[in-house]
Amino acid sequence: DRYTGLAHYLEHVMFKGTDKIGTLDWTTEEPIYQQIIAKYDEMADEADPVKKEAIGKEINELTIQAGKVSVSNEFSNLMESMGGKNLNAATGMDLTYYHNSFPAFQINKWLEISSQRFLNPVFRTFQSELETVYEEYNRGQDNPWRVQYDFIQSKAYEGHPYSRSVLGLPEHLKNPRLSQLIKFYNDWYTAENMVLVLVGNVNANQISGRIASTFGRLPQKATPERKTYPDLNIKGRTQYTAKIGQYPSVCMIYKGVPAGHPDEKPLEIALALLHNSSATGALDKLSIDGEITNGSASLEANRQQGRCKIAVTPLYDENQRRFESNKSAEKKALKAIQQIANGEVEDWIINAIKTNMCREFDQVMEASENKALILLQAFINEEDLGQVLN
């Protein structure tokens, strides 16, 4: 908790090469790199703003020196040279994943370069990436939807890391330690904590040996013990109010289930009875009938905890040019929820929702990228692949 946002920072700098990729002269670059690491620790420990600024200037000078003997975008260029596309990465609540597409005949070259990426990475241009991440944070603060989402998360998962953005806390973004980023990499980027997902025109039996000789070089060691967090003990009603966004809304949070739980799919169906893409849910009907402006219902199932989120926006009265009260909108939503709980749902709607969910799954599985993400999530959530795919 002292160094939040490390997983996301790491996602950014994992594109900057290694001691072999991205360097013109590692013998010259390495001592400069070590000085940069030490200077970030020194700056983090310094409380005097003037001295901090002076250290920052030293880091800038060292970064310029390192840039003269390095090519920080060489990894991306290598991927592009073999026909690779869509090179990117993302960090979520439970994982960071790196992805791209490439021609099947380049599989051997891809395995070599991609595995090399995770061997002795060098976090070049850390200074500029810090600015990029902080700009990402600032854009989020200017977005009322993002501020509202962050507020809801902070209450929905209070006491758990899910309660905060993957970007990290602002005080940590302002006071980074490159040494902690390296420690995070060494702790968590191990063979037992990673998975390789290949989807497309590949024969697993033919390339298994090549995978073993490339990705098999990753260090095999135990990861630190994962901290566990008790789930919220929700009793009765707890209400929070904040002036966020451009118009009023009510968001009701209920304890859900983690990903892979036997009740995950039943809960998704139950929430789809309130809101779905075909607009046949109880909240959808309220919106169509002019009782509310709009409504939504969804299950957020993470690896450790889950939440049911039901949101409604009060009806806007065009004649009086004002919204109805949040209390009125909440009352209508609770009535719709109770109807579902009482089983006041026609069978055809339930069957239509299940059919639509199956159709959407089949459509998603038509794209290799989506199929890879589904397999990845199954691994992260320790789900049975047979059940996930069927």
What are these regions (language model features)?
Residues 117, 121-125, 138-141, 158-166, ...:
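An aromatic/glycine/proline-enriched structural segment found at the starts
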Residues 173-177:
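Short, charged, amphipathic alpha-helices and their helix-cap/turn boundaries
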Residues 133, 262-270, 287:
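PPIase-associated folding chaperone regions across multiple families
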Residues 123, 130-131, 145, 149-150, ...:
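Non-catalytic, conformational "gating/processing" segments within enzyme and secreted inhibitor domains
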Residues 93-97, 127-139:
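Short, glycine/charge-rich beta-strand/loop segments that flank catalytic centers
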Residues 87, 182-187, 236-242, 299:
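Short, surface-exposed beta-strand/loop micro-motifs that present aromatic residues
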Residues 204-208, 262, 319-321:
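Extracytoplasmic/secreted cell-surface and envelope-processing proteins
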Residues 1-9, 16, 20-116, 147-171, ...:
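M16 family metallopeptidases and their MPP-like homologs
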